[in-house]
Amino acid sequence: MTGVQTCALPIFNYGESDRIVSLFTLEHGRLRGFAKSARASRKRFGGQLEPANRLAVTFSLKEEGLSRIERVEQSSCYPELRERLESLALSLYACELVETLTPEGHPLPRLFRLLSTLLEHLTGRAGSAADRRFFEINLLNILGYRPVLDTALLQPLSDCLKTGSFGKIRFSDAELEAAGRLLDREIAGHCSRPLKSLTFLEDLG
């Protein structure tokens, strides 16, 4: 069995009490696991299997198919994310982006740190449009999908690639609009399906 630090991505109920869980790990990248009786066993899972939670997970790793999740312990559950809808929406969107755009079983340590940093940043504050665009451009860059940033209005996006800290780069309204047009188009082009969390995020404005 293997113990790793993970970020929980989308989670699906299976049958009456089981769950199929997508996890993003530092060591193994994105994995899919089967958590038997996850909705019934608080001793083994403690109700921690929720999207955007940082978890210490013990599981039996399989090269193909679903790994078996044996035990989950809380690492950082970020309860504040669920107290502000803007933060919750952005964290769910970021997790779904990682789930959709990353290959299974391929370590991406820079992206793991980016996602972890976003979740920590959103603790205690509302997620902003600038936070969203910072995450998106860095995610695309890490995955090798970096778009051309060749106009003055896109300069803040270039600056986002030079710092690892959310909240450092300021956007004017025009710059934020230009960044949104570009990134929305680029991300849609790499996604095989519409993102469910995007509707929730955009409904909040």
Residues covered by each model-derived region:
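Non-catalytic alpha-helical scaffolds and adjoining flexible linkers that form interface surfaces
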Residues: 8-19, 24-205
